[in-house]
Each structure stands twice: as C-alpha cells, then as structure tokens.
Regions:
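Hydrophobic anchor residue at the start of the ABC signature
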Residues: 149-151
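Q-loop/switch helix immediately C-terminal to the Walker
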Residues: 89, 96-108
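Conserved ABC ATPase signature
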Residues: 136-144
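ABC ATPase NBD coupling module
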Residues: 67-83
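Helix-to-loop junction immediately C-terminal to a conserved catalytic motif
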Residues: 50
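Conserved ABC transporter NBD signature motif
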Residues: 58-68
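Conserved ABC ATPase "signature" region
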Residues: 2, 115-132
Length: 212
C-alpha cells in the first residue's frame, strides 16, 4: 500500500505553557519516519504510529513482527538481555521510553542483542563530541532522551523509525550541528518529521514539517 501510516496524535503540552494541538502524521510505504518531540502523556509516539490511535490498531508490523503481539515475558527478557547489558556510562537504562518498543522487533526478527549493542556503542562513540549539547539545564531527562535518540537513529531495519529527543532549548547553531551529526547516519530515502516549537534547520529538505 502507498500509505504506511496516517496517525493523529494529541500532544499534551500544558506543562510547558502550550495548548493541546492535534498533529496529523502521514508517511509512505518504505519510508523511514523520524520524529523529534516529547510526548507528555503516557502513550509514546511509537504507540500512536503503530496502533493505539489507528483504525487498524494492532495490525502494523515492524520487521515482520507485530509489536502488540509481544508478551510481557518477551519484553522483560529483552530489557534484561539487551538493554540491561548496555554499559551504564552511556546513560542508558531500561526505563528509557521506546528502546524496547523499537528494538524488540529486531530481536524477534533474529537480530541478536550483541549486534544491537555494538551498533549503539559505535554510534554513541561517534556522536560523543556532541554529548554536552544535550546536557541542558532545567531538562533533567534531556541527556537520557538524547541517548535514546541515538538508538533510534541507528536501528535501520524497521520501516518506521522514531527519533525522539529534546531540541527545543538549544541554540540554532547547536541544533544545526546536532542535525548534521544525525544526517550523516540517517538511512537514504528517509523522511524526517520535526515536532518542535523551535525552527527547523534551513538546510533540511523536509518532506513534511509539523510544529507543536
């Protein structure tokens, strides 16, 4: 099918002084979709895109695996064997949102945990010079979500990729530098949907720009 997803997401942004807004997200089959934003409700972007608010809830597959068919045991096992084995100096903890939700389909599709960890280590090492850009005062989760974003960017197999992290409070120069870093490892023919109150870098060829 031409349309891979057409999801609506109601962003609860009252905590940062903004009103709720409805975002419509559309992508085509074969696209990699990166989303940069910070959902304030319990649901994640992944859940929105892959089921909870879709009319075909529970039918979307990543790597041939339906994430909603995962059992609690499978999820717990993956967190322990894969995420829990990631060195703590990378700031990665099992509670980080969406790590298991995006990577678990890879695990179930036959991608071993060591391979995932190796890719995470490699990418994190490459982007470490930008590490301080994510350490923003007043955003206690920024650093963790930045590492989560690195994981999002390196997992190339799923058709939908979620790029999730705070960029609202960095300067335009730093934001451009961050974009350039992720652009170098972004899969070809991918789509980036930027969910943020901050302006997008001018050099980005946006297929679609959604602003919260």
């Amino acid at each position: 099918m031409d349309e891979l997803m057409n999801a609506n997401y109601i962003a609860d942004l009252k905590s940062i002084g903004r009103k709720d807004k409805l975002l419509s997200i559309t992508g085509k089959a074969g696209d990699n979709i990166f989303i940069n934003g910070s959902p304030k409700r319990c649901e994640t972007h992944f859940e929105v895109l892959c089921g909870l608010r879709r009319p075909d809830v529970g039918q979307v597959k990543l790597c041939g695996i339906n994430p909603y068919e995962m059992t609690a045991v499978e999820t717990a096992t993956f967190r322990r064997d894969t995420i829990g084995a990631v060195p703590q100096d990378l700031g990665l903890i099992p509670e980080l949102r969406m790590i298991d939700q995006i990577a678990l389909p890879m695990k179930l599709a036959g991608v071993d945990g060591e391979t995932i960890i190796a890719e995470i280590r490699k990418l994190t090492s490459e982007l470490m010079p930008l590490h301080n850009l994510f350490n923003i005062p007043g955003k206690c989760n920024t650093r963790k979500q930045a590492h989560a974003a690195m994981i999002r960017a390196v997992i190339r197999n799923p058709q939908i990729m979620v790029f999730h992290g705070f960029l609202d409070d960095v300067s335009d120069i730093d934001r451009d530098a961050i974009w350039q870093a992720f652009h170098t490892i972004r899969p070809q023919n991918s789509v980036l949907i930027y969910l943020s109150g901050a302006p997008a870098p001018e050099q980005v060829n946006w297929t679609q720009q959604l602003r919260v």
